[in-house]
């Protein structure tokens, strides 16, 4: 499978959830999530992602509002992406702050992080209504899916503008190397080609890092990657500014 032209840039959206996780582990306001957003933007990040979960384990509604206010003057240059399950309070918050993009993600009880994309047999009536409501407010809608034909076609059926390919399986198979690595990339490339042929954009995220990203960024038609855990972990040793720049060096 032929990859993307290495000269074409892919947007980086920095997920700042882990900054809020660290803050909440102690209480108080340190480290500041908005300060982290400022540092990411100063380093050149063209996107910021948050995933405000119902239990508020990291990002809170207040964080979302504060980040939205900080990014408002930069709307033409820095995209804001809010991830989450389509629960009523989250959709109301998204409609309030009007990010560029809302990535709808299925949530399993007790999960630490997202573990799978939407199933193609998910009841779609309510989801279709949510997607249309967001799009009427000019909010792009992306659906978190596995790199398989059925969920990608389902995403198109329910009206998504983009899909976000769940990349944990790619990261695992990349680490295995050899034919396993090649087969994994080919499967994701085929998924991207299908989504593109259906008129949807392609995002990706989960366990992407500086080791596996150079290959993955050549994925055909890839628009954006959302990276949080690996980037924030690297920042502990290099500083946040340097960590963001290291990822941008791979993507641009």
Indicate residue ranges for each PLM-predicted region.
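Conserved N-terminal beta1-alpha1 strand-loop-helix module at the mouth
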Residues: 1-85, 95-99, 154, 180-183
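Histidine/lysine/aspartate-rich catalytic loop segments that bind and position anionic ligands
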Residues: 109, 140-194, 198
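Catalytic cores of alpha/beta
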Residues: 87-97, 148-158, 204, 208-222
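Alpha-helix-loop-beta-strand connector modules within alpha/beta enzyme cores
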Residues: 57-88, 122-142, 180-204, 210, ...
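Glycine-enriched alpha-helix->loop->beta-strand junction motifs that scaffold or abut catalytic
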Residues: 44-46, 71-73, 96-102, 136, ...
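Hydrophobic faces of well-ordered beta-strands that scaffold small-molecule active sites
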Residues: 10-16, 48-50, 78-84, 102-104, ...
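Glycine-rich phosphate-binding active-site loops on the catalytic face of alpha/beta enzymes
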Residues: 46, 103-111, 162-175, 221-240
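C-terminal helical cap(s) of enzyme catalytic domains, especially alpha/beta-barrels
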Residues: 176-181, 234-252
């Amino acid at each position: 499978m032929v990859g993307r032209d290495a000269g074409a840039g892919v947007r980086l959206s920095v997920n700042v959830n882990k900054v809020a996780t660290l803050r909440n582990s102690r209480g108080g306001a340190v480290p500041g999530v908005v300060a982290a957003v400022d540092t990411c933007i100063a380093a050149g990040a063209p996107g910021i992602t948050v995933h405000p979960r119902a239990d508020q384990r990291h990002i809170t509604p207040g964080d979302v509002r504060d980040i939205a206010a900080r990014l408002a003057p930069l709307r033409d240059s820095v995209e804001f992406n809010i991830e989450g399950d389509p629960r009523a309070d989250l959709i109301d918050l998204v409609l309030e702050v009007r990010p560029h993009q809302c990535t709808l993600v299925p949530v399993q009880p007790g999960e630490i992080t997202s573990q799978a994309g939407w199933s193609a047999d998910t009841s779609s009536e309510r989801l279709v209504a949510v997607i249309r409501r967001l799009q009427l407010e000019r909010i792009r809608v992306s659906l978190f899916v596995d790199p398989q034909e059925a969920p990608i076609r389902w995403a198109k059926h329910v009206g998504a503008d983009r899909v976000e390919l769940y990349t944990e399986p790619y990261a695992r198979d990349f680490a295995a190397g050899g034919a396993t690595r090649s087969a994994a990339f080919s499967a994701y490339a085929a998924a991207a080609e299908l989504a593109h042929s259906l008129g949807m954009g392609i995002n990706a995220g989960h366990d992407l890092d500086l080791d596996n990203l150079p290959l993955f960024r050549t994925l055909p038609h890839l628009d954006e990657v959302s990276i949080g855990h690996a980037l924030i972990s690297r920042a502990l040793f290099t500083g946040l500014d340097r960590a963001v720049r290291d990822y941008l060096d791979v993507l641009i």
